[in-house]
């Protein structure tokens, strides 16, 4: 006889309550849009925001839960996943606020856009807690396919179609590479799919052949993850996709998708690859160096705000990798804190870009010349967000970088931290270049677009949500610096409450000693 209570205990469906709320919200928006048509745009954005806020409340109720394993080990609702899922949900809320006016102007259905965005959010949230290979791949593909659809959503725009095609082709290749890597893990572990079981199985085997194959699996898995976080040299899609995609979509990809990628990186590398810890540290060190240097250097030559922010996001990914490479409690906590403040300063910057493009139809940096004289509030908001991205005190970005660099320095990553400081200083130049251009005082230096700058009416449909999103982002960017200590304490608490990371930090030395005894060379032919 089937014991339903045992099955219910093993499934532990409460672990995915936040995702369940997002699914219900998605269905409400979808059905409402089908029944009411265009008139549903008056309430669908707010219904989606309420649902996402409900998901955040559900995440809060799970904070101190000790029963975090659900669905036979496929999902882990530990504090680490709660932190990342919260960041993803907040990024989705902000994206919805900034997208209403933009999507309405393009003439495409808003309800469908929100449904696809909620699906991408759902995939990213599941990916943050996925603890099993099948769950990881399904979540990753849910996020990826939704992202492709969002990228090409404004189908009347040829740039959007081109961006979607490039993203689809490169993303499909990346997914195939990642799938090959995790299929190797499945074979090496003797058919295990849970990450902890895979690590235990390979630790018990420990032969030279398994070690070589494990490194190959590691390389393929890192390639797939690097595509998702836009790490060099897997970044080629980023500038073109960011430039051609709808700006709210770019904002979500730069934060929500990237946060999910880093959550996957932590869980997969720490849990499944402890025997090759030195190898993945070496690979990510190279990725961090390339991302920080190329991202911040190439950004200096950009003439489009969206391309500038694209290369900026590549450089920011390099900074976040320092926390991953530190492999300490402070390192992982600094990653979470930086992604949280990066959410607000980056989305705030994109909100300002949307406001400017709605009124001028351009995102060229040269057209921002003299903006202060016509729109001082927009100039102030964009300046604060850009200066925070550059790490200027006392804004949130400064404290985020301080925590990352300090964690890296304590872990002995001296040259990497010094390179991070140098490239961070270089990034300040291209951020301040935009700020300086906006505050020119001479009338003859103003761009033609600014000379004919139209007045804004906040009473137009979708403008109020955009205004709220901008105010919240700018305030958070400004105040998060003052509140950095309690926010970092919260991030540190999420690491301390995660058994996976605690055990990994304790066993790092043991794993390295075991790995040093393994032979990674190819067998010689007799």
Swiss-Prot record:
TM helices/strands, residue ranges: 16-36, 43-63, 80-100, 110-130, 133-153, 168-188, 212-232, 246-266, 280-300, 308-328, 336-356, 380-400, 402-422, 468-488
Protein name in UniProt: NAD(P)H-quinone oxidoreductase subunit 2
Pfam families noted in UniProt: Ndh2_N, Proton_antipo_M
Entry keyword set: Membrane, NAD, NADP, Plastoquinone, Quinone, Thylakoid, Translocase, Transmembrane, Transmembrane helix, Transport
Quaternary structure (record): NDH-1 can be composed of about 15 different subunits; different subcomplexes with different compositions have been identified which probably have different functions.
EC number of this enzyme: 7.1.1.-
Membrane protein topology class: Multi-pass membrane protein
Function: NDH-1 shuttles electrons from an unknown electron donor, via FMN and iron-sulfur (Fe-S) centers, to quinones in the respiratory and/or the photosynthetic chain. The immediate electron acceptor for the enzyme in this species is believed to be plastoquinone. Couples the redox reaction to proton translocation, and thus conserves the redox energy in a proton gradient. Cyanobacterial NDH-1 also plays a role in inorganic carbon-concentration.
Cross-referenced InterPro entries: NADH-Q_OxRdtase_suN/2 (IPR010096), ND/Mrp_TM (IPR001750), Ndh2_N (IPR045693)
GO biological processes: ATP synthesis coupled electron transport; photosynthesis, light reaction
GO-annotated cellular components: plasma membrane-derived thylakoid membrane
UniProt key word Zinc-finger: no
Subcellular location field: Cellular thylakoid membrane
Coiled-coil residue windows: none
Annotated catalysed reactions: a plastoquinone + NADH + (n+1) H(+)(in) = a plastoquinol + NAD(+) + n H(+)(out); a plastoquinone + NADPH + (n+1) H(+)(in) = a plastoquinol + NADP(+) + n H(+)(out)
Location (main, coarse): membrane
Top-level division of the source organism's lineage: Bacteria
Family as reported in the entry's similarity comment: Belongs to the complex I subunit 2 family.
HAMAP family: NDH1_NuoN_1
Molecular function, one GO term: quinone binding
């Amino acid at each position: 006889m089937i014991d339903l209570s045992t099955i219910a205990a093993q499934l532990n469906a409460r672990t995915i309550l936040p995702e369940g709320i997002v699914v219900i919200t998605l269905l409400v928006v979808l059905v409402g849009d089908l029944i009411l048509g265009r008139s549903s745009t008056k309430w669908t954005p707010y219904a989606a925001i309420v649902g996402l806020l409900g998901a955040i409340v559900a995440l809060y109720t799970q904070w101190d839960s000790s029963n975090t394993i659900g669905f036979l080990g496929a999902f882990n609702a530990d504090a680490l996943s709660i932190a990342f899922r919260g960041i993803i949900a907040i990024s989705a809320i902000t994206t919805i606020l900034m997208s209403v006016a933009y999507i309405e102007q393009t003439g495409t259905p808003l309800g469908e856009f929100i449904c696809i965005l909620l699906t991408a959010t759902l995939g990213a949230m599941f990916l943050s807690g996925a603890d099993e290979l099948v769950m990881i791949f399904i979540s990753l593909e849910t996020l990826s396919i939704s992202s492709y659809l969002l990228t090409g959503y404004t189908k009347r725009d040829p740039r959007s179609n081109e961006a979607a095609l490039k993203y689809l082709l490169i993303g499909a290749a990346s997914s195939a590479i990642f799938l090959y890597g995790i299929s190797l893990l499945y074979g090496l572990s003797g058919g295990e799919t849970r990450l902890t079981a895979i690590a235990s199985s390979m630790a018990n085997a420990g032969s030279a052949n398994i070690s070589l194959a494990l490194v190959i699996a590691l390389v393929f898995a890192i390639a797939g993850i690097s595509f998702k976080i836009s790490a060099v040299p897997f970044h080629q899609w980023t500038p073109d996709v960011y430039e051609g995609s709808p700006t709210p979509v770019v904002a979500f990809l730069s934060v929500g998708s990237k946060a999910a990628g880093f959550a996957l990186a932590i869980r997969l590398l720490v849990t499944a690859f402890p025997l090759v810890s030195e190898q993945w540290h070496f690979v990510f060190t190279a990725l961090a160096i390339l991302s920080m240097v190329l991202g911040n250097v190439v950004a200096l030559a950009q003439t489009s705000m969206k391309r500038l922010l694209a290369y900026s996001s590549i450089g920011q990914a390099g900074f976040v990798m320092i926390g991953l490479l530190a492999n300490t409690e402070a390192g992982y906590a600094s990653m979470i804190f930086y992604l949280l403040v990066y959410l607000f300063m980056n989305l705030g910057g994109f909100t300002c870009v949307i406001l400017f493009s709605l009124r001028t139809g351009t995102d060229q940096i040269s057209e921002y010349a003299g903006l202060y004289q016509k729109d001082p509030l927009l100039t102030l908001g964009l300046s604060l967000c850009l200066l925070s991205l550059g790490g200027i005190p006392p804004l949130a970005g400064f404290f985020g970088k301080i925590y990352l660099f300090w964690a890296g320095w304590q872990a002995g990553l001296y040259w990497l931290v010094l390179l991070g400081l140098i490239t961070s200083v270089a990034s300040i130049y291209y951020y301040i270049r935009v700020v300086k251009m906006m505050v020119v005082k001479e009338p003859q230096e103003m761009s033609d677009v600014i000379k004919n700058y139209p007045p804004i009416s906040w009473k137009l449909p979708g403008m109020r949500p955009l205004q709220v999103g901008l105010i919240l982002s700018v305030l958070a960017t400004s105040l998060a610096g003052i509140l950095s200590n309690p926010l970092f304490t919260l991030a540190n608490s999420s690491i301390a409450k995660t058994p996976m990371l605690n055990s990994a930090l304790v066993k790092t030395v043991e794993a390295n000693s075991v790995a040093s005894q393994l032979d990674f060379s190819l067998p010689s032919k007799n």
